[in-house]
Design a protein with these regions (language model features):
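Hydrophobic alpha-helical bundle cores within soluble ligand-binding/oligomerization subdomains
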Residues: 1-303
Length: 303
């Protein structure tokens, strides 16, 4: 399956002809954003040369207190329309200007997700400093996760955003529309179900019992045909390479993490019993648990 940006094969996927699995461990979030938006890695320096304006930061700081208690996705939808009031350049819909607006939105989302006050050295660094400041190893993991989720061109979230973009809306409005779709049960709801399943399972010794209980109850996620939450993908018949890589990277950094050990057992049992492999959502939830990210952290990275 192929679009203007992404190509999916049975076991790989590509951004503008570049293997996304390789990009996840060799390039920065900013470089991959430049590739997706312009087709050129080197455009990173010009696109990300400007920080958020003082007026945008002032607006963000003013509403920070009202974001307390919200999940990152909820906070995004509160913050974006308000900060957009101070970004008049967002109404410039020429391709280069839209890409530059995209960089400002990325910087803003990184701050909102983590409750940060000022953008730091790159998107991944901002997220790591806000969520896992005590562990520099988390930066590479978070960067890989963001890159693996950089383009969602084939799902309903992106389709919604494209429809809004086709009406000549600003990038802020486009992103807000995509976030609305993302909060549905097929995305945010899916990560919540995975989290609930892992909490219920609790330990590797309970995995087979938990899977058996799911099978007996006949539970599934509408539209995905999954029995075990986070497994099976219609786009990847031999397994979602994004989920596989993210699980491997997390295990390399935190091999003894209870979250990793549980995920490994779930993966083994599900493949043995059902022949299904983990999706990107399962990888994100496992990484979020290993890093002890706040509620909603996994789906925020997907966004």
């Amino acid at each position: 399956m192929e679009t203007a940006i992404t190509m999916i094969t049975d076991d790989r996927f590509y951004y503008r002809g570049h293997d996304a699995l390789v990009l996840a461990t060799t390039r920065s979030v900013e470089q991959v954003a430049a590739l997706i938006w312009t087709g050129d890695f080197s455009a990173e320096s010009s696109l990300f040369s400007r920080a958020l304006s003082d007026s945008m930061l002032a607006r963000y700081h003013k509403i920070c207190s009202s974001l307390a208690g919200l999940t990152p996705l909820e906070a995004f939808q509160v913050c974006l329309p308000l900060v957009a009031l101070d970004d008049i350049a967002a109404y410039d819909l020429r391709a280069e200007a839209v890409a530059q607006t995209g960089t400002r939105i990325l910087q803003l989302l990184a701050l909102v997700a983590t409750g940060g006050q000022h953008a730091t050295r790159g998107i991944a660094h901002t997220v790591q400093q806000g969520w896992v400041p005590y562990d520099e190893r988390a930066k590479a993991l978070l960067s890989a996760a963001l890159i693996l989720c950089a383009d969602q061109e084939l799902n309903v979230t992106t389709f919604t955003a494209r429809c809004v973009a086709s009406a000549g809306s600003t990038p802020y409005a486009v992103v807000c529309s995509g976030l609305s779709a993302l909060q549905g049960i097929k995305h945010a709801g899916q990560t919540e179900r995975i989290e609930a399943f892992l909490r219920e399972t609790d330990a590797p010794s309970n995995v087979r019992t938990s899977i058996t209980n799911l099978l007996k109850r006949g539970e599934s996620i509408p539209g995905f045909g999954e029995v075990v939450p986070g497994f099976g993908s219609v786009f990847y018949p031999v397994g979602d390479p994004r989920g596989k890589l993210l699980l491997e990277l997390t295990a390399e950094v935190y091999p003894q993490s209870p979250a990793v050990l549980l995920a490994q057992r779930v993966t083994e049992e599900t493949n043995t019993l059902l022949g299904e492999r983990p999706t990107i959502f399962f990888g994100l939830v496992t990484m979020a648990r290993a890093l002890n990210l706040p509620p909603g952290g996994a789906i925020a990275l997907f966004a």
